[in-house]
Amino acid sequence: MAKPVVAIVGRANVGKSTLFNKLIKKRIAITQDDPGVTRDRLYMEAEWQNKYFTVVDTGGLEPKSNEIITKNIKKQTELAIETADVILFMVDGKQGITPIDMEVADMLRRTKKSVILVVNKIDHIKQQDNVYDFYNLGFYEIFPISASNSMGLGDLLEAVVSKFDDNSNTESDDDITKVCLIGKPNVGKSSLINNLLNEERMIVTDIAGTTRDAIDSKINYKGNEYIFIDTAGLRKRKKIDTEVERYSVVRTLSAIDRSDICVLMIDATEGVSEQDTKILGYAHDQGKAMIILVNKWDLVEKQTNTMNDFKKDIRTKLGFVMYVPIVFISVKENKRIDTLFTEIEKVDNNYSMRISTGVLNDVISKAVLLNPPPSDKGVRLKIFYITQIEARPPKFLVFINRNDLMHFSYQRYIENQLRENFSFEGVPLQFEFKTRGK
């Protein structure tokens, strides 16, 4: 399900980054080796009253000269209008209205998106009178705040979440598997979509996507129906700069959120990039099924073990998703496209798999005998019971004697045992541990 997107726009030095940090502060739980994209702190999840949304930080857009200020702000605002569900237009309450503020306001008044005017740096009640002048910008909803000391943030967040449509994330065709194509520009995502759309054996119906600029394709392939989500925002442009890339990634994250299977497309002539790692890390964190698709394989000189060597290189760089299948195709030559759908069907079945409690406990009992759990100060970890509580993705509830004894390495061992005994290729496994007395 796609989260609403909240963008903070405004000229430099009005406090956008400070507000961003305040909004996401309680949601930060990132380790240094976290593969997820959110480590960049350009776009992060925030929560208020159990409503989750993505906040986009445009705080890094600090122009180097007066000549490019207007151009940068215009671009920033256009991207916010295009991408966001709610726009926080931030101004400086101490400095007052500037010509750039007026220009941004003029652009925002023409959009149908929800716009909230945020007057920052109102640090004292005596400064409240400064707020009234900002009604000249033409916005009814004005919130005075002090981002640095959190004054007024509660009221602002109340207004933000009130803009979210409770039904806006409701998906039609809930029973149809949704496949999201992700990857860098120019790896062949659009070419693959076009190939699928032009295939005579496929029945295609264009449907309106729930994201702002994506067109989803409903494809019937050999009796199986899928919805392919094309991340249109990542299509190559003549120039990809910081602002455009930032919002493009937000569109991709939104597409991942509402998908079931994420297909990461890689250019065989370039290999795995840092962006690939981050985007796949986000899909992994969100519990999505995954496939790695290597395109342009026709351009690679073939030698003995070429494909195996390429797979090893991918596994080395994407070690956190060793369970994900790797498929090699050539969209241009129309080769091995069938293998992609074979893997999609297989991974989708794995994603929905449910295993009976009795079978699960038999497997875990044997695993414990083969490799006894760790102990600490004479107390050994005991696994009493395991049961599957969810599918898509599979989630397991494990009852143990002490949580602190369940080391990461032993959890990985349990996961590997499940993967060896059941077909979970392409699917992340999730675990919840609960303590229980003897």
UniProtKB/Swiss-Prot annotation:
Gene3D superfamilies: 3.30.300.20, P-loop containing nucleotide triphosphate hydrolases. Pfam families: KH_dom-like (PF14714), MMR_HSR1 (PF01926). Residues 353-437 form the KH-like domain. GTP 2 binds at residues 183-190, 230-234, 295-298. It comes from the Bacteria. One of its GO terms (molecular function) is GTP binding. Residues 4-168, 177-352 form the EngA-type G domain. GTP 1 binds at residues 10-17, 57-61, 120-123. One of its GO terms (biological process) is ribosome biogenesis. Keywords: GTP-binding, Nucleotide-binding, Repeat, Ribosome biogenesis. Belongs to the TRAFAC class TrmE-Era-EngA-EngB-Septin-like GTPase superfamily. EngA (Der) GTPase family. Associates with the 50S ribosomal subunit. GTPase that plays an essential role in the late steps of ribosome biogenesis. This is GTPase Der.
